[in-house]
């Protein structure tokens, strides 16, 4: 049961955000209230959602519970953010393809907390829109079961075992000042299905440079970038590329 984990985290002064960021079927969404109620009563800090029906249900039944909208919603613009805000969205995790300039404009015109991906895998498709894993092996990314077939080698022409679909990992630790200037409220670091040592190590590096806002040393950058599948800056990959959308 996850409830003791919630209590322990709060004892240590750590907030807990519960992920419900998949598309829900009819029978599942009918059970959502009963599923969330024990967490809500224990002081859950926020819930992360993808399904619009779940968003409305949570807003109606738990009006004082903070709702964060997942990158699986593929939120890319001002009107989407304004719509989500009407249904209780407090924070929006922007699609990884959104530029820093676009995030800044959204923040200034919508007044909603912006969360941005800064470290981890980049999707070959678009956030929340990829059906590759679902079509290839029946494991849908929109159900939290992506098998990451894009990481596998494929044949391209006369070339065998080429990783043509496997993107470099994002590493945005050198772009913290730009993210701050864009109005980004929170940073998202990939941790799901990762070992605890990886997650704690990456978070520790980001925490250090967020607190100091000093220029990242070459040694630290090499260390943190080496934890993933090579690297790209946020400014060189998703957050500044006009062709990603």
Where are these regions (language model features)?
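Beta/alpha (TIM)-barrel catalytic core signal, keyed to glycine-rich beta->alpha loops juxtaposed to Asp/Glu
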Residues: 74
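Surface-exposed amphipathic alpha-helical tracts and adjacent flexible/coil segments at the periphery
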Residues: 4-22, 26-40, 49, 53, ...
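Conserved nucleotide-cofactor-binding alpha/beta core module
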Residues: 78-79
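Short, small-residue-biased leader/transition segments that mark boundaries at the very start
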Residues: 1-3, 232, 236-245
């Amino acid at each position: 049961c996850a409830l003791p984990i919630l209590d322990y985290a709060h004892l240590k002064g750590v907030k807990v955000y519960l992920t419900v960021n998949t598309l829900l079927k009819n029978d599942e969404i009918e059970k959502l209230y009963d599923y969330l109620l024990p967490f809500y009563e224990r002081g859950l800090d926020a819930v992360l959602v993808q399904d619009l029906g779940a968003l409305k249900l949570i807003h109606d039944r738990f009006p004082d519970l903070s709702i964060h909208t997942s990158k699986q919603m593929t939120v890319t613009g001002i009107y989407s953010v304004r719509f989500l805000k009407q249904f209780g969205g407090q924070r929006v995790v922007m699609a990884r393809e959104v530029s820093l300039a676009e995030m800044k404009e959204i923040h200034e015109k919508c007044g909603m907390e912006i969360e941005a991906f800064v470290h981890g895998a980049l999707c070959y498709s678009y956030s929340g829109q990829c059906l590759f894993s679902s079509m290839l092996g029946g494991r849908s990314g929109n159900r939290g079961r992506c098998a990451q077939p894009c990481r596998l080698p494929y044949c391209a022409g006369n070339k065998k075992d080429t990783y043509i679909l496997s993107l470099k990992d994002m590493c945005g630790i050198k772009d913290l000042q730009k993210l701050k200037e864009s109005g980004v409220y929170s940073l998202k670091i990939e941790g799901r299905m990762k070992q605890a040592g990886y997650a704690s190590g990456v978070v520790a590096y980001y925490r250090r440079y967020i607190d100091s806002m000093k220029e990242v040393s070459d040694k630290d950058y090499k260390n943190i970038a080496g934890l993933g599948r090579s690297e790209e800056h946020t400014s060189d990959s998703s957050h500044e590329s006009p062709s990603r959308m």
